[in-house]
């Protein structure tokens, strides 16, 4: 399942990516978000009731607390966290990350991270480097 979150739900979009879900963060106008959702077959997640009413395949999220937003999405769409997919997407740009050799990140991550971790991943688009705990 793929998502697009409206501009009020940037933190939720980031956490859906952490859980491995392909999630765009839309900062365009409502018509643009709907077009992307339709073209890419994405569920539109929004806090905007009007936007929700304009697009059938949308989910209205109420409240501002992240934990409740995540729980609401997971429960409403019957989603589960799949640990195989968790941490598989860049939290910044949504691109799938790929594993990278430890020697390739030397000098590019904090020394403590380099010394205490053996597994690293990189986003091929924005070049952000990840390790367990980032």
Protein language model features and the residues they cover:
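Long, charged N-terminal interaction/targeting segments
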Residues: 1-85
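Short, glycine-/small-residue-rich phosphate/pyrophosphate-handling segment
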Residues: 88-90, 101
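Metal-cofactor-dependent catalytic cores
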Residues: 25, 125-134
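Short metal-coordination and nucleic-acid-contact micro-motifs, chiefly zinc-binding Cys/His arrays
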Residues: 83-87, 116-119
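A short secondary-structure junction signal
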Residues: 102-105, 134
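Short linker/helix segments within small regulatory modules
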Residues: 106-120
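Short functional micro-motifs and their immediate structural scaffolds
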Residues: 95-99, 131
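Short cysteine-rich clusters marking metal-coordination/redox-active sites
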Residues: 90-93, 123-126
């Amino acid at each position: 399942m793929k998502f697009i979150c409206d501009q009020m739900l940037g933190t939720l979009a980031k956490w859906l990516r952490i859980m491995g879900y392909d999630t765009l963060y839309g900062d365009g106008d409502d018509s643009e978000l709907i077009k992307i959702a339709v073209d890419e077959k994405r569920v539109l997640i929004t806090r905007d009731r009007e936007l929700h009413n304009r697009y059938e395949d949308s989910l209205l999220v109420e409240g501002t607390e992240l934990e409740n937003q995540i729980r609401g999405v997971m429960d409403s769409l019957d989603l589960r966290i799949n640990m195989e997919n968790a941490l598989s997407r860049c939290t910044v740009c949504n691109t799938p990350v790929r594993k990278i050799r430890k020697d390739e990140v030397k000098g590019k991550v904090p020394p403590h991270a380099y010394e205490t971790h053996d597994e690293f991943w990189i986003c091929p688009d924005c070049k952000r480097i990840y390790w367990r705990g980032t």
